[in-house]
Each structure stands twice: as C-alpha cells, then as structure tokens.
Amino acid sequence: MILLQHAVLPPPKQPSPSPPMSVATRSTGTLQLPPQKPFGQEASLPLAGEEELSKGGEQDCALEELCKPLYCKLCNVTLNSAQQAQAHYQGKNHGKKLRNYYAANSCPPPARMSNVVEPAATPVVPVPPQMGSFKPGGRVILATENDYCKLCDASFSSPAVAQAHYQGKNHAKRLRLAEAQSNSFSESSELGQRRARKEGNEFKMMPNRRNMYTVQNNSAGPYFNPRSRQRIPRDLAMCVTPSGQFYCSMCNVGAGEEMEFRQHLESKQHKSKVSEQRYRNEMENLGYV
C-alpha cells in the first residue's frame, strides 16, 4: 500500500530558472544608486579644504614667530617675566593688534591667545586682578595700588612697574599739587569758620551795646554828653571840659568842635590876649607888679 501511494502522487514541481535579464531588472528596480557628480567637482572640494588648512597653519606659524614667550614682535614689547607676558597677551592693546593682524590676513581670530603662545619652562604666576574685572560668580574685584594709580589715572601690569611709577617725577609732581590744593582748601574752610564765629560773636554783642547806649541816654548827671566821645589831641587836653567841649579860659570862649577851637587859637583876639598875659607874667617875675 505504501508503494502504491508513492506511485500515485505526482512529483513536486521544481522552480524554473529565471533568465539573467530578469535579475538585472529586479535589482535595478529595487536598488537606486545616487547620481554621480562630475569628476571635476569631486576633485575641487578636497583641494579647497587643503588650501584653507595649509593657509591657517602658515598663519599660526607666523603668529608663533611674532609672539614669543618674552618678546611680542607684533606690539614691539619686551617682557620681563611670565606674569608680565601673560598680562600683556591678555590685555586690550595686544588684542587690538591681533584683530588688525587677522583682518589684514582675512582669517578669523582664535578664541584664546593664551593657547597659542605659552611661556616655555617658566612657572605660571596668577595675574593680579585688573580694575573692573569680573569673576564667574559676578563678584567685582577691586584694584589695589599695585594695579592702578587713581591720582595719575594709570594702570600697571606688575608690582615692579607700579613701584617705578610711584618713585617717578610725574607721580611726585601730582602728589605735591594735590597736597597744595588740600592745604588751601583746609585753610579757606578754617578762615570761613573763624569769620562765621566772629560775626556770630559780634551779633551777640550788639544787644549789649544797645542796652549800654540806652542806659547812657537814660542816665542823667552833671557830666552827661549826648554826643559820641571824640578823640582829643594831646596839645588840647587841658582845654577840654568834662562835658566834652573845648574852652579857652583866657578869652572865656567855648567851642563844640576841634576845628572851631583851633580857628579861635589862631585868631588875633586870642593872640593879643596871649601876648598880654605873657607880658604880665614877665613883669611879675621881674617884680614890677
């Protein structure tokens, strides 16, 4: 029975081999290749990139030649220490010269100059804080006397430069001028205070003077003189009465003013009286009277 079943069943169909053209058509239909660029364009792109890289490398080499660890040929500045070199390369003047250099060579400047030029075989000392610099936390760092001179409006790159400035002639001259101005201002303020104090004392004394004047006016006596007491010359001291008037006992004449009394002394009447009195005195001395 088993043999008959095998004989009755038809043989399985074998897949017919497809022609080679159909395989080619199927592969081209499923796989799409990108369009190929011309040969001239493919060759031009790597050449342009190589030219830019070579140009940038040449400029970096030239910049390294210009910016030595202790001499900046770009700014024509000789540096004494690594601290001064770092301060110079991070300063405004060097940054300006560096931007001009890159603008002339039509190449963008690097992000940091300190990565390009570094002092060789020298310990790096932290740069003193400059005026107006900020930390990442937003804290303001105030400048010290080794960084900035407020009197001369000058900033320093190192303590040695600051010490040389403070010992120079320009700083000494400005210091003398500032001291002279401060002394003159203090003297003027003291003079103003003294004047105000004096005026205040005089103002306080004015009521006392007024009271004294009213007491004198109200007082009555034999020697009361309502006029202000005038200055009496020495030669007329014997001719002044207690009331303040001038009196000539020889002529029995009085005068209220000094000029009037002097005119009386120069008059003929007074001179004749004086001559008569002198003659009488002489005769009395001789014993004729």
UniProtKB/Swiss-Prot annotation:
It is found in: Nucleus; Nucleus, Nucleolus. It comes from Homo sapiens. This is Zinc finger matrin-type protein 3. Residues 9-20 have a biased composition (Pro residues). GO terms for molecular function: RNA binding; zinc ion binding. Acts as a bona fide target gene of p53/TP53. May play a role in the TP53-dependent growth regulatory pathway. May contribute to TP53-mediated apoptosis by regulation of TP53 expression and translocation to the nucleus and nucleolus. The lineage of its organism: Eukaryota, Metazoa, Chordata, Craniata, Vertebrata. The keyword RNA-binding applies. One of its GO terms (biological process) is DNA damage response. Residues 24-33, 180-191 have a biased composition (Polar residues). SUPFAM superfamilies: beta-beta-alpha zinc fingers. Keywords: Apoptosis, DNA damage, Growth regulation, Metal-binding, Nucleus, Protein transport, Repeat, RNA-binding, Translocation, Transport, Zinc, Zinc-finger.
